[in-house]
Structures are given as structure tokens and as C-alpha cells.
Curated annotation (Swiss-Prot):
Chain sites annotated for binding substrate: 797
Cofactor: [4Fe-4S] cluster; Mo-bis(molybdopterin guanine dinucleotide)
Residues spanning the signal sequence: 1-35
Key words of the record: 4Fe-4S, Electron transport, Iron, Iron-sulfur, Metal-binding, Molybdenum, Nitrate assimilation, Oxidoreductase, Periplasm, Signal, Transport
Residues binding Mo-bis(molybdopterin guanine dinucleotide): 86, 153, 178, 182, 215-222, 246-250, 265-267, 375, 379, 485, 511-512, 534, 561, 721-730, 805, 822
Function text: Catalytic subunit of the periplasmic nitrate reductase complex NapAB. Receives electrons from NapB and catalyzes the reduction of nitrate to nitrite.
Enzymatic reactions: 2 Fe(II)-[cytochrome] + nitrate + 2 H(+) = 2 Fe(III)-[cytochrome] + nitrite + H2O
NCBIfam families documented for this protein: NAPA, PRK13532.1
Name under which the protein is recorded: Periplasmic nitrate reductase
UniProt-listed GO biological process terms: cellular respiration; Mo-molybdopterin cofactor biosynthetic process; nitrate assimilation
Length: 831
């Protein structure tokens, strides 16, 4: 009797899996998954997690065209088989009952009407109306009248296609990602200090550090997998310590050896105190400083990123200035000398002994320190400053760019690094850290994209907060939102957000898988494929680029953001978007569409369908007739290769669990700027911060300056917003997972028991929380995971039934243009 091939394969794979399991050996070649697939009918394949910037890898199980299970990928170096609670329920995020499956257009009596009701339409009709509105705006006001708001959740090639469409096609820099709300201050900190973006260290530092310091980061809930690695080191490595700083006590404090609750905005003063402590105790690494660091100070009194007519902007001496001035070490030492332990303790509310204990961790030359931060630093009206102040401390002692010594900026979105930052989807950026303001950068980009000289505008476009202001003012008229829920996420929504969306001069398109606050404010809704319904790539917080295959098809007529971008480009001739002056420089483009010039250009369309993976769908490639993702990736990768942003070949990423760039000669880079790790550091130099032409990093002195809005007699509490473990961002995915919704069904206002008592409030009681911009009903919570100090309340923003961003202030860091969601004044009253 002959055993069938499938049966023989099953027996062989099962035996291998059993043997490996008994020995504790993971099977990297997929043999165990093969055995499980044969026995259950489930196919397993890898993908990057859809949620945060940690970049966990998961195994996706599909059966009969549906994702039926996910599990942690045991071969993934990031998460080593673990998931957080959100990751374990990934299989359910695509199957909410209200999934969008057809384009919806506001209509009355069968024609588009801004005040009409949503009706299903075909893709052709949707794009016909949308293209007409964009053409009308371009004809009337030019390229600055059109814009796009994108995402750190776009795949790498979606972000690249969007940036190319806007900057090369429509000649508008009015494209910005929602990463402006979360990572822009980190970017400015990197660029000013090092001349190049993204962390120099990697997750391996969690196993090498002696001390971990969290600044404005609740890793226990927001980066739980990384927290598990940190926790493992703390519990197994003798002498290791955890220090946590925040404006309220959260779950990360449970592991803290030194937990510090400080007054909002005073992190600026604390960091200057640490620098002063290092200098005054004689622990400056003078050799490192003399070889590798220049010292500067920044312009001060720079305003708060508010409208120009706002009183605080009018009063600023140097509004929006990022000017740096060289200073001597003695001048720097004198500047930080005023930040004594007594002064900073009084200002911040942190006991002096705790501040000294913290400062000693950095000063002690025998301790390796990993500093970690995220939104508490970045969503800050001095976010760019506070990022640089963090680097100042590490540079003073030379604790940087080596295992365990790592100032590490954590990211919140799965590809805020890989797409928003590296691709250049910000209003001022181009691929590989280039910027539109630089003539040489624009010229290089135009050459690579085969564009006439002068195609890309030299002036930065409208950033996220400015986009809302320009929509409201009627200067931005045709607007496309993809892969975010900005009407729930953006600040001061009532005054600056919603009016622009409903301005009768404007046409708003929103692409999303689900109905959201943003889609319901739009004129046209486009149904979007999500996660493994398309082939994708993300770049995580440690510079790791990861790919996945399309696993299942999107429901109904839903299409990926990439398909939408490329298909929409076919609706415009080059004559309609460029004009005669540019066309005269490249007459060979006459008569072509934007699609022909940007995508069917001999580069993007050079890889045949035969190169796509056998056994997997690839809907975009099948539609356009070539391997779209590979073409876009290889064209994009050409910007960074040889320029310290090297990416590996396309196929390499499908065969691996990701690589950390720069990838040179097939080798990833764990530590940048350090000889022996980074191929861009010449032999014999030891350390070279090559982002700056002189190879040196910058210490940037900046003082403490207060927040723009502080509690007073009427609005007597600080309002801080943020996230919780169970939900991600606006909850548009996680609230459709029944288990996650039940675990945390509604937002609450976390309040100190004494503050509640003083207002006659009890736990669970309905209250009204208000600011100068609006009010909202909620319920008071005086217990639970978040223990706030007196004078401050914390409110999560995931709940579309409680739009807390009606209340927040649209103040930003004037340099990064990132919103401060952590500090404004509010009051709480009985409802």
C-alpha cells in the first residue's frame, strides 16, 4: 500500500515537530507549521503586527479565505513568540460587522451634495467626482489648495507612492502623516543633535543595560513586549535598576526602584539638573566630548505653535526659531548650573534624594544606562528641546552607541519610522532624511524620479495642525485622509478640525476600513483593505524593516491605499498638473497621465507578475500587471543605499524576520556611529556621528520654559490624555474586537480621591469635564491602574463616545509642529 504524498509529508513533518518540541528547538524552516497546516487545513505565514511600533512578528493562520488565528512568532528576534493582549486578538480586527465594502458619496437626488446623505457608488463614480473636485481646486488656487493626511500605519510602499503622487505629481508638499502627532519631536531631536534620524541603538540593549530610565513612557501598557524584556533583565541581573518619571503614576511604576511623579513641563529642568550634576561631580567624559561633540545653545522664547494672531505667539520674542549658536563648555556649564537639586526639586515636586539617585545612574561611569521615552517627551510644546536635552546627558558621559548605553526613542505606530520618517511623508521631507528646503536634495529626487528641474516646491507644505487651520480658512480645498482617524485624534477638534471638514468650499475624502468619526465628517468614503489583505512592509523602532505576503482578500469592493493612490493618478494628465513651463523641459512626458510618469515609468513597472509569490494573492500587482510592491520598494531603496540608509534586496525581507538598517553586504547594523558595528565609521575613528559633516554630535542647551496653558482659579486641573493597554489609538480596530471592548468598554476620567471629594464626587459618578474649548460627559475613576496626583486628571482617547480632543489645546512644539496632548487646563464638575 502506498502512502499519499500529502500523508507522507504530514507524518514526516509531525515527527520533526515532535522531536524539536521535546528538545525545545524552534523550527525556523516552517516544518512545524507545515505539519499543523496539513492536520488542520490552516495555512500559517509570518506578518508584522498591525499595532504599535515595537514590530512584533506574528504567525497568521488562514483557512477558506479568512484569518482564523494569530500567534506569536517563535523565530522573531523582537518578541520571541510572545504577543501582548492586542496581538493575540489580531485575527479579529478585520471582521467587524460594520466593515466598509463600497465607496460612499454624499448625495441628494442622485448627485453629489455636501449636505446630502451617504449613498453607495462605484469606484469609477467616486474617482470621477473626486478628480473633478481636485481639478477645480488646482485650476482655481494651484497646488497649495490640495493636500493629504497619511499615516505611520501606511505600508512602506503606500507611503512612498503617496509622497511621490503629492510632491512629484500634484507638485504639492501638503502631505503629512499622523506621525506628526507622535514622532515629529523625536525626528527634530535626532536631526539637530546627530544630523540623521532614528535610534543608534537596538532592542539588544534591553539585555545589556544596568539601568533603565523611562521618561514619559508607560511601557508596561504601551510597549508590553519590550517591557517583558526589560523586566526579565531587572529580575535576573543583580544590581540592575528601573527609574520611572511621569506626571502620574501608572503600571510601569510597579517595577520601579525609583518612581518619580513630576509637575508637567518640568522634565526640562530635571534633565538640565542631571547635566549639572554630571559636571559638578567631575564625571564628564572629557576625551569623548573633545573628540565627538560640539556645544550649542538654542533660541528661546519661541512661542507655542498657535495661530499667528494668538496672544502667546504675539508675545514670543523668537517665534518658531530653531537657531543654534555655538558656546563654550564653560558657558554651557554656567547655563545648567542654575538647575540645582533644591531648585529643581521645588519646581518639579520630586524629592531631592530621588533626583540625586537618578542623576548618579547617568554619572557613574560603571553603569550602562538605557533611556526610553515616547509621547510624554514628544507630545510637548518643547518636545524638540527635551529630546535634545536627553542626548546632552548621554553625550556628556559618552554613554551612547554601544551595547547597553542607549538613548532610545520608542515609536507608537507600526511604521512611523519605516514609512513616515524613512520614506519622507512629512510636509518638509523627502526619502532618506532629505528635505524639500535643500536645493541639492530636491535636484537629486527629481533626477531619480525623472522630473523636470523645479517640479518639487522648495517650501514645506502644511503640517498636520496647519492643515486643519487651512481647511477651516478655505485655503486647502481638496483633501484626502488615509489610514488614520484624525477627527478623533487631532487637538481642539471643535474649533479647528470639524469646521474645515464641513467648510462648503472643501471636498474631503477619507479612506478607511470602518466607519469612524473622520469618515462621518467626510464627503466621500473609500473602503480600504487592511493588514494582511495586501502585501506590506513596516519599519519598527529599532530600524528593522519587515515584510509580509497578502494572506486573504479584502471584502466587497474594498481596495488597498496603494491601489487607490495609483488608480487615482490615472485621472490626471501631466498637462493638468504641471503646466507648460515644466513640460517644455521634458516634452517626452506630453500626453501622459500622472500614472504613466510616476508609476509606469520603466522602474516601478519593471518586475513581472511572475516574480510574485506562488500560492499567494497580490491584488494590486494583478490589477496593474506587474509586481507593484517590488518596483516601488527598489526605486525607494535607491535613495538610501550608499548613504547610511541602506536597505537589503526586496527578496531578503520576505525570507527573514526583518533586518536593521543600514544593511551593507548582507549584514544588518546593531549600533550606529560606532566602529566595529557601523560600516560607515572608518577604521580607527572609534565613534563618528556622520550625520553632521564634521562627524560630531551637538549638545544643545535649552532652558526650562512653562507650558502655554496652566491651571488657574476657573480651570484648576491639568488635563493629560493618552492610551491604555487594551486599545490602540482611536479604537477603530480594537473596539471591534469583543474581548478587548469588554475588557475596557468606555473611557473614564482618572482623578485623585481628594480632588473628587473636594468636588462632592464619588467613583463612577457622571461628570462634566471642560476646558476653554469645549466640554464632555464622562465618569470619574478614583482607583485602578492610573494613580494621578492631586491637581491632574488623565483621560484615555480611544473612545469615540467621549471625544476628549474636543477639549485639548492645539499648541505644538514650534520646531517639530507636534501637538502637546499632555498639558492644558480643565475643570471637572458634577454632570
Amino acid at each position: 500500500m502506498t502512502i499519499s504524498d500529502s500523508r507522507r509529508t504530514f507524518l514526516k513533518a509531525s515527527a520533526a515537530a515532535a522531536t524539536a518540541s521535546a528538545a525545545g528547538i524552534p523550527l525556523a524552516n516552517g516544518t512545524a507549521a507545515e505539519a499543523q497546516a496539513i492536520s488542520t487545513g490552516i495555512r500559517w505565514d509570518k506578518a508584522a503586527c498591525r499595532f504599535c511600533g515595537t514590530g512584533c512578528s506574528v504567525l497568521v493562520g488562514t483557512k477558506e479565505g479568512r484569518v482564523v488565528a494569530t500567534q506569536g512568532d517563535p523565530d522573531a528576534p523582537v518578541n520571541r513568540g510572545l504577543n501582548c493582549i492586542k496581538g493575540y486578538f489580531l485575527s479579529k480586527i478585520m471582521y467587524g460587522e460594520d466593515r466598509l465594502t463600497m465607496p460612499l458619496l454624499r448625495k441628494t437626488n442622485g448627485v453629489y451634495d455636501k449636505n446630502g446623505t451617504f449613498e453607495p457608488v462605484s469606484w469609477d463614480e467616486a474617482f470621477d467626482v473626486m478628480a473633478q473636485k481636485w481639478k477645480e481646486a488646482l485650476a482655481k488656487k494651484g497646488p497649495t489648495s490640495v493636500g493629504m493626511f497619511g499615516s505611520g500605519q501606511w505600508t512602506v510602499w503606500e507611503g512612498y507612492a503617496a509622497a511621490k503622487l503629492m510632491k512629484a505629481g500634484f507638485r504639492s508638499n501638503n502631505i503629512d502623516p499622523n506621525a506628526r502627532h507622535c514622532m515629529a519631536s523625536a525626528v527634530v531631536g535626532f536631526m539637530r543633535t546627530f544630523g540623521i534620524d532614528e535610534p543608534m541603538g537596538c532592542y539588544d540593549d534591553f539585555e545589556h543595560a544596568d539601568t533603565f530610565v523611562l521618561w514619559g513612557s508607560n511601557m508596561a501598557e504601551m510597549h508590553p513586549i519590550l517591557w517583558s524584556r526589560l523586566t526579565d533583565t531587572r529580575l535576573t541581573k543583580p544590581g540592575s535598576e528601573v527609574h520611572v518619571l511621569s506626571t502620574y503614576e501608572h503600571r510601569s511604576f510597579e517595577l520601579a526602584d525609583n518612581g518619580m511623579v513630576f509637575a508637567p513641563q518640568t522634565d526640562l529642568a530635571i534633565l538640565n539638573y542631571i547635566a549639572n550634576y554630571i559636571i559638578s561631580t567631575g564625571r564628564v567624559n572629557e576625551d569623548f566630548m573633545s573628540k565627538h561633540v560640539n556645544i550649542t545653545k538654542t533660541a528661546t522664547d519661541i512661542g507655542y505653535g498657535l495661530r499667528d494672531e494668538h496672544a502667546l505667539q504675539q508675545e514670543a520674542e523668537n517665534p518658531n526659531s530653531g537657531k543654534l549658536e555655538p558656546i563654550s563648555f564653560d558657558e554651557y556649564a554656567a547655563s545648567v548650573a542654575e538647575y540645582t537639586v533644591d531648585k529643581v526639586s521645588e519646581l518639579s515636586g520630586v524629592p531631592a534624594a530621588q533626583l540625586e539617585k537618578l542623576a548618579e545612574q547617568y554619572a557613574d561611569p560603571n553603569r550602562k544606562v538605557m533611556s526610553l521615552w515616547t509621547m510624554g517627551f514628544n507630545q510637548h510644546t518643547r518636545g524638540s528641546w527635551v529630546n535634545s536635552l536627553m542626548y546632552n546627558v548621554h553625550l556628556l558621559v559618552g554613554k551612547i552607541s554601544e551595547p547597553g548605553n542607549s538613548p532610545f526613542s520608542l515609536t507608537g505606530q507600526p511604521s512611523a519610522c519605516g514609512t513616515a520618517r524613512e520614506v519622507g511623508t512629512f510636509a518638509h521631507r523627502l526619502p532618506a532624511d532629505m528635505v524639500v528646503m535643500n536645493d541639492a536634495h530636491r535636484a537629486l529626487t527629481e533626477k531619480k524620479w525623472n522630473l523636470p528641474e523645479g517640479t518639487i516646491p522648495a517650501k514645506p507644505g502644511f503640517h498636520a495642525v496647519l492643515q486643519h487651520r487651512k481647511l477651516k480658512d478655505g485655503d486647502l480645498n481638496a483633501y484626502w485622509v488615509q489610514c488614520n482617524n484624525n477627527m478623533q485624534a487631532a487637538p481642539n477638534m471643535n474649533e479647528e478640525g470639524y469646521p474645515g471638514y464641513r467648510n462648503p468650499e472643501n471636498f474631503i475624502t477619507v479612506s478607511d476600513p470602518y466607519p469612524t468619526v473622520t469618515t462621518m465628517s467626510a464627503d466621500l468614503i473609500l473602503p480600504t483593505a487592511m493588514w494582511v489583505e495586501k502585501e506590506g512592509a513596516y519599519g519598527n523602532a529599532e530600524r528593522r524593516t519587515q515584510f509580509w505576503r497578502q494572506q486573504v482578500k479584502a471584502p466587497g469592493e474594498a481596495k488597498s491605499d496603494l491601489w487607490q493612490l495609483m488608480e487615482f493618478s490615472k485621472r490626471f494628465t501631466i498637462e493638468e498638473v504641471w503646466g507648460e513651463e515644466l513640460l517644455a523641459k521634458m516634452p517626452e512626458h506630453r500626453g501622459k497621465t500622472m500614472y504613466d510618469v510616476l508609476f509606469a515609468n520603466g522602474k516601478v513597472d519593471k518586475y513581472p507578475l511572475s516574480e510574485t509569490a506562488e500560492g499567494f494573492d497580490n491584488d494590486e500587482s494583478e490589477h496593474f500587471g506587474y509586481y507593484v510592491q517590488k518596483g516601488l520598494f527598489e526605486e525607494y531603496a535607491g535613495f538610501g543605499r550608499g548613504k547610511a540608509h541602506d536597505l537589503a534586496s526586496f527578496e531578503t525581507y520576505h525570507q527573514s524576520r526583518g533586518l536593521r538598517w543600514p544593511v551593507v553586504d548582507g549584514q544588518e547594523t546593531l549600533y550606529r556611529f560606532r566602529e566595529g558595528y557601523d560600516p560607515y565609521v572608518p577604521e580607527g575613528e572609534g565613534v563618528r556621528f556622520y550625520g553632521h559633516s564634521d562627524g560630531k554630535a551637538k549638545i544643545i542647551y535649552a532652558p526650562y520654559e512653562p507650558a502655554p496653558e496652566v491651571p488657574d482659579a476657573e480651570f484648576d486641573l491639568w488635563l493629560c490624555t493618552g492610551r491604555v493597554l487594551e486599545h490602540w489609538h482611536s479604537g477603530s480596530m480594537t473596539r471591534r474586537v469583543p474581548e478587548l471592548h469588554r475588557a475596557y468598554p468606555a473611557a473614564v476620567v482618572y482623578m485623585h480621591p481628594e480632588d473628587a471629594k473636594a468636588r462632592g464626587l464619588r467613583r463612577g459618578q457622571e461628570i462634566n469635564i471642560s476646558t476653554r474649548r469645549g466640554d464632555m460627559l464622562s465618569r470619574v475613576e478614583t482607583r485602578g491602574r492610573n494613580k494621578v496626583p492631586q491637581g491632574l486628571v488623565f483621560v484615555p482617547w480611544f473612545d469615540e463616545g467621549q471625544l476628549i480632543n474636543q477639549l485639548t489645546l492645539d499648541a505644538t512644539c514650534p520646531l517639530s509642529k507636534e501637538t502637546d496632548f499632555k498639558k492644558c487646563a480643565c475643570k471637572v464638575e458634577r454632570a
